[in-house]
Amino acid sequence: MFHVEEESSGGDGSEIDEEFGGDDSTTSLSRWVFDEKDDYEVNEDYDDDGYDEHNHPEMDSDEEDDNVEQRLIRTSPAVDSFDVDALEIPGTQKNEIEDTGIGKKLILALQTLGVVFGDIGTSPLYTFTVMFRRSPINDKEDIIGALSLVIYTLILIPLVKYVHFVLWANDDGEGGTFALYSLICRHANVSLIPNQLPSDARISGFGLKVPSPELERSLIIKERLEASMALKKLLLILVLAGTAMVIADAVVTPAMSVMSAIGGLKVGVGVIEQDQVVVISVSFLVILFSVQKYGTSKLGLVLGPALLLWFFCLAGIGIYNLVKYDSSVFKAFNPAYIYFFFKRNSVNAWYALGGCVLCATGSEAMFADLSYFSVHSIQLTFILLVLPCLLLGYLGQAAYLSENFSAAGDAFFSSVPSSLFWPVFLISNVAALIASRAMTTATFTCIKQSIALGCFPRLKIIHTSKKFIGQIYIPVLNWSLLVVCLIVVCSTSNIFAIGNAYGIAELGIMMTTTILVTLIMLLIWQTNIIVVSMFAIVSLIVELVFFSSVCSSVADGSWIILVFATIMFLIMFVWNYGSKLKYETEVQKKLPMDLLRELGSNLGTIRAPGIGLLYNELAKGVPAIFGHFLTTLPAIHSMVIFVCIKYVPVPSVPQTERFLFRRVCPRSYHLFRCVARYGYKDVRKESHQAFEQILIESLEKFIRKEAQERALESDGDHNDTDSEDDTTLSRVLIAPNGSVYSLGVPLLAEHMNSSNKRPMERRKASIDFGAGPSSALDVEQSLEKELSFIHKAKESGVVYLLGHGDIRATKDSWFLKKLVINYLYAFLRKNSRRGITNLSVPHTHLMQVGMTYMV
C-alpha cells in the first residue's frame, strides 16, 4: 500500500490573516463600526472557490458606480479567524532553548568545539604537505611566502567573511545554503513552486526586517526577482549547485582528514606503505559513519574535550618549534611576502593555492552547523581559541621546515617532538574523526531543509536529541556517503588528489554563500552599497583565484567528486521540477465549486457517519482526487476535512499558529479545508491519535469563532435596518486584513466569483436582509447543532483518505521531458519516504485511491 506524501504545497488565494502580538485585552475591546466609502475594490487574490450561502442579485456596472457603500471595520487589531489556535495565546511562542547558566554555557562551548571546529582544526595536518607538493621549497623565503598566504587566507575567509558577515545571515538560528534561500524566499516571492499563501506572512517567523519603502534599491531588487522567471530559476540552480557541493564535501572531508592522520604512521613506523594506510583508513571510516547515529548531544561532550586537547597540542607544538628552530617566521604577517612568493615561483605559486585553500576548509561548517549553537558562541570560540591555536600551529611548522626542507612531504608529524609523537598521533586521529563528523552533521541539516522546501526526495530523519530539535541523523544519506567515501579513498589512494577534490567542493560552497549573502545584504539588511561591493568583490576575487588553481588539477582524480556532485544536483533538480509540474497540474485539475453545488449536500452519493481526513497538496480549492473518491467509493463520510501539510520558509511555526481552517460550501455540506503549517526545522512526532485530537479541537474553535462573527453580523443588521430603506444600498464587510464580505454572509464564508467577471475586476455584493440569522439565539442553536454533529462523527471514527497522485508525460512531449518525468522523477517518488508514515496510521484507518495526471 502507498501513503500520501506531505508535499509542501499551497495556493495563491486569499486567506483571512492574523496580526499577532496583541493581548487579550485589546482583542476583547475590539468593536465594529460603519465607515462610509463611495468606492471599494476587492483584493484580486480573493478566493475563487468559496461559496455564498445566500443568493445575491447581480448589479449592473452602472448601478454599482452610483451606489454608496458602507464598510464595517474593526477599530483595533484582531486575530485571524482561521488561525484558531492563536486565539488561545495570541502572539506567544515558547523558545526551544532556554537561557542557560555558566555551567551549561561551558558545556555548550565544549560541544561547539566538537561539532563545529573539527574540520578547520585538522587542516594543519595536510595544508603545507599539499602546498609544497605543488610548489617545492627552494629556499627559506618560499616557506615565509607560503606561510603568509595561509595566514591571510585564514584572516580573509574564516575570520572576516564567515565570522563577521556570513554568520549573521542566519535564518532565525539556522545556517546553511537552504537557510539563506529560505530567508530570501520570505522577503521576495522567488520560489518556483507557487504554494505561497498571504496568511504565511502573518507567521511570527516572518517578522524579520523587510525592505524599507524608503530604500528604492531594495524594492527594485525585490520587484525584479519576483518578475523574472529566469532570475528565479538561476537562483534555484545556484542553491542546488551549492547544496550538491555540501554533500560532496561530506564525502571528501572524512577521506582527507582520516587519511592524513593515519599517514602519520609512515613517519612514526617507517615501514608502513601507502596501501596499508588506505586499508587502515577504510576501517576508521566505517567506524566513523557507524557511530554517527548516536548524535551530537551524546558525542559532543566526549569529542569536545578531545578537540580542546588537540588545539592545545597545536599551540604547544607550535610554540616549541618557534623557540627551538626559527622565530623569524613571524615576519610572514607582512603581506609583501605573498608578492615575493609569486614573483619567485610564478606558475608553481599559483598551483600552491590549491593547497593553501585547505587551511580554510571547515569555514562553511561553522555556518552550516549554526543550528546547533549560537552565533556568539561560535564567534568567541573561533576568535579566542581556534584562530590563535591554528596560527601558532602553522608558525611552528614553518619554523621547523625552515631548517628541514626535506620534511615537507609530511610537515605536521615531522615537526612533532619524538617524545610526544605517539600521544599526538592518537589525539590527531581522534581529531580527524571529529572533523569528519563536522561536515556530515552539516549535510544532514542542509538536506532536512531542502526536503522541507521541496528540493530533495523525502528521507527518513531521526532526531537524536530530545532537547535540541536541530540534531538529526539521516540513515540512508549516512550510508550513501560512506560508500562514496570508500570509493574515493580506494580509487585515489593519496591525499593530494583528495585534497584537490576537497578544494573544489569547499570553494563551490563558498562562492554560492558569497552570492546569496550579497543578495541578502542588498535585499534584507539594506547595507551600504560600498560595504556590499567590498564584501562581494573581495570574496569572489579570492575564491575565484583559488578555484582556478584547483580546477587545473581535475584530471588527477578529483573528477570523481565532480561526478558525484553532478548526480546530487540532478536528483534535486529533477525532484523540484517534477514536484512543480505535479503541483501546477493539481491546481489546474481542481474541482469547480459549481460541480459540488450541483451535486447537493449529499455530494451525489451516500454520506456515511464518520470523519474523513483527505490528505492533499492544495491549500486552496478542492483537489481532483476528491472527485475520484466520489466516483470510486460507494459512500463518503458525513464530514470531510481536506488536510494540507504545508511547509513554509521559516525555521519553525509556533503551535499557536499551526492551523488554518476554512469552510468549503454551505454548512450542510460539512466540508472543511485545513492547512497545517510547519517550518523546515519543525519535528512532526505526534501520533495519528494526537493529530486527530488537535485538529478536531481546532475545528471546534474555528466554528465557535465563526458563530461569534455571524452573531455580530446579525446584531449589526438589526441595528441598522431602520436607517436603510432602499435595498439597492450595498454594505460590504471589511475584515481586519482587508478582505471583503457581504453582511448577509457569515464572516468566514467564501465569496464566489461571478463567471462573467475577471479576477482583477471589482467585486461587490448586495445583501438580502431577510436571509441572515434572525437573532443570536438562532446562531447559538446552529452552533450547538453543528458541534453535536462533529462529536457524533468523531465517535463513528476517523478515516484517512489518501490519494496517490502521479504524473506522466504526454505522448507528444519532447524526449527529455519524458525521460525526466516518466523515469527519473517516477523512480525518485517510488523510493522516497511517504509523509503519512510520520503519523503511524494503522492500515485499518486507511482508504487509498490512485490517480495519474498527464503533463
From Swiss-Prot:
List of residues that carry Phosphoserine: 766
Gene symbol of the encoding locus: POT13
Primary location class: membrane
Name the record gives this protein: Potassium transporter 13
Native organism taxonomy: Eukaryota, Viridiplantae, Streptophyta, Embryophyta, Tracheophyta
Organism from which the protein derives: Arabidopsis thaliana (Mouse-ear cress)
Extent of Acidic residues compositional bias: 36-51
Residue ranges, annotated region (Disordered): 1-67
Residues bearing carbohydrate: 404
Residues on Cytoplasmic side: 1-105, 164-233, 290-298, 368-379, 437-467, 525-528, 575-855
Cellular component GO terms held in the UniProt record: plant-type vacuole; plasma membrane
